[in-house]
A protein has these predicted regions:
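Catalytic core of pol beta-like nucleotidyltransferases
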Residues: 2-82, 86-91, 98-180
Length: 180
């Protein structure tokens, strides 16, 4: 079991974020996470955001998330050059995760809690047909590479039998470039 975590935030900041429908804060309320209640304050109900507010929040969230994806891609290329293919697959998984998060944040102001690329891809496909064609599943090689990428988050670090070839990592990088 995970140890409890404490987040200290003043009520005004919390309510401002809640009012703006920031996913982290709305999830706290939606999931019924226990908050200290001294009975002096009430939680704000989120208001309907204007188009400008939605655009500003989407831009801010994108600008925080997308650069991480680009950084992870950069390190995946470095790992490829250095022959550290499993590390490259891990970095590439992280890049994909951040790219999918960026898409969700822009379209619905929400970041899923999942690290599972199949789940993230499934959520994002509805926004663009091109997302559905990033990872092809026509050949055994394409299916195998996608499977390697999906497993990289855990197995690249903990499974001694997890192996990625230069050819596989190169192919995965080419596909993720399309997502970028």
């Amino acid at each position: 079991h995970a140890a409890p975590q404490f987040i200290v935030e003043d009520i005004n900041s919390f309510n401002k974020a809640l009012d703006q429908k920031r996913y982290f804060y709305t999830d706290i309320v939606k999931e019924g996470i226990k908050l200290y209640d001294n009975k002096k304050f009430k939680l704000t109900k989120p208001h309907e955001l204007s188009y400008k507010e939605i655009k500003d929040i989407a831009t801010e969230e994108f600008n925080k998330c997308y650069p991480f994806a680009i950084g992870f891609m950069k390190y995946a290329y470095i790992a490829l050059e250095d022959g550290m293919n499993e590390l490259g697959a891990f970095q590439l998984h992280q890049a994909c995760e951040r790219l999918y998060y960026s898409i969700e944040l822009v379209f619905v102001n929400y970041r899923p809690k999942s690290h599972k690329l199949k789940d993230l891809e499934s959520k994002c496909k509805k926004y663009s047909h091109s997302i559905a064609s990033v990872f092809l599943h026509h050949t055994d090689f394409e299916k195998h590479c996608y499977d390697l990428l999906c497993r990289a988050y855990i197995e690249s670090r903990y499974n001694k039998d997890y192996v990625v070839t230069k050819e596989e990592l190169t192919y995965m990088l080419q596909r993720v470039e399309l997502l970028k």
